[in-house]
């Protein structure tokens, strides 16, 4: 069997959104080559884990590669992908060159080709993300290993938005909390929350493919076996009160869930948001403070921001 590779040259900030578009179009897998991965590695404060030669050296931007069975009707799905990618700037995401190329890949090449883009990465002081096929052992007692199968490509921990969110969770969680993870994708934030001591974790995603991928990744991490994963539109209809709500999604989508987040957070609860590009930060903060949230901390990597907010206790 042969596979069709659809390759999109884009900007780093659009990688996760384009990956999701490709999966929605029916891709069997997605691989990402991102110049930011090299930058993240070289500036990593948490110790070198990898040999830099494991990364493919592209100088700028990113390449997203999706793989479809040769029987796929590309004439139907290509317009869908192109149209949705062209809409990303409406959400504040640069799509860079946005050049799409198509080629054939043999079955033997497809089986292993995409795996070369994923290796163990220390993403925070305590958390290391390891692909499911890699043999890796903790370097010290404090290191926690999150095992992921990135074949479904819903965030693998190396994108700035994911790393910033993980750092924020590590800052906030002290043990025993109830956490709501909105737009869970791969489930990495929910798994991290359990490793960082959260007692009850609920993970939601509108995309059934993401829900399935998250459940598979929970199975790879026994500590997360009791995470509740389900399909849901943001926090609509949810009635679980929470100590922490975390959302690594587009800024415009975060604004839509602010009132529900306020409703569900306990007094002195914490709202962690990420996926905020510089151009959208002021708009999001204005909407949050209007409801009553108070900014506690900001994290940034380049133009990307994660923000920790508090719901003040009533006087």
Curated annotation (Swiss-Prot):
It is found in: Cytoplasm. It catalyses: L-lysyl-[protein] + 3 S-adenosyl-L-methionine = N(6),N(6),N(6)-trimethyl-L-lysyl-[protein] + 3 S-adenosyl-L-homocysteine + 3 H(+). Its EC number is 2.1.1.-. InterPro entries: Ribosomal_L11_MeTrfase_PrmA, Ribosomal_PrmA_MeTrfase, SAM-dependent_MTases_sf. GO terms for biological process: methylation. GO terms for molecular function: protein-lysine N-methyltransferase activity. S-adenosyl-L-methionine binds at residues 162, 183, 205, 248. Its main location: cytoplasm. GO terms for cellular component: cytoplasm. Pfam families: PrmA. It comes from the Bacteria. Keywords: Cytoplasm, Methyltransferase, S-adenosyl-L-methionine, Transferase. The keyword Nucleotide-binding does not apply. HAMAP family: Methyltr_PrmA. Belongs to the methyltransferase superfamily. PrmA family. Methylates ribosomal protein L11. This is Ribosomal protein L11 methyltransferase. It comes from Enterococcus faecalis (strain ATCC 700802 / V583).
